[in-house]
């Protein structure tokens, strides 16, 4: 814990640029790296994977009967940030319930935890623009390419 800095300021000031990886046109931060950085600064930080009860016992995903999503949270210094994320395939499209595997759910949990960590500040900029409609994303990518050429 750094004096006079909020959790957000402390984590947001960590340069993660050399740890950012890309896959299928999207940038991401490894969950292991993100969690390691959080624990270095805040050893008492905790995460939670939400579960729901079934007749067979608790399971770690939620469903509407068609697709599935996971819910996780990260708590640092008493502040909990919750993140929900669809269970997706390698193209980042929702997986239908009949095709869902435990591997898919586990990957979604780790990605969700990384996004919950980002809400606390670490690598938050990585997710800027991910909520833009596809047309706006394409325009933004064109502008970024043009700026890189200049």
Question: Language model features by range: what are they?
Answer:
Residues 1-150:
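Polyanion-binding surfaces on beta-sheet-dominated domains and ring/shell assemblies
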């Amino acid at each position: 814990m750094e004096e006079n800095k909020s959790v957000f300021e402390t984590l947001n000031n960590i340069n993660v640029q050399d740890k950012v990886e890309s896959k299928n046109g999207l940038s991401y931060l490894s969950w292991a790296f993100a969690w390691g950085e959080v624990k270095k600064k805040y050893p008492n930080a905790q995460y939670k994977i939400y579960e729901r009860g079934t007749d067979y016992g608790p399971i770690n995903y939620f469903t509407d009967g068609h697709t599935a999503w996971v819910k996780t949270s990260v708590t640092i210094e008493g502040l909990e940030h919750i993140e929900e994320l669809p269970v997706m395939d390698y193209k980042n499209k929702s997986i239908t319930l009949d095709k869902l595997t435990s591997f898919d759910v586990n990957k979604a949990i780790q990605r969700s935890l990384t996004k919950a960590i980002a809400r606390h500040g670490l690598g938050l900029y990585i997710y800027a623009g991910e909520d833009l409609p596809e047309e706006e994303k394409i325009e933004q990518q064109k502008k970024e390419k043009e700026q890189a050429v200049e």
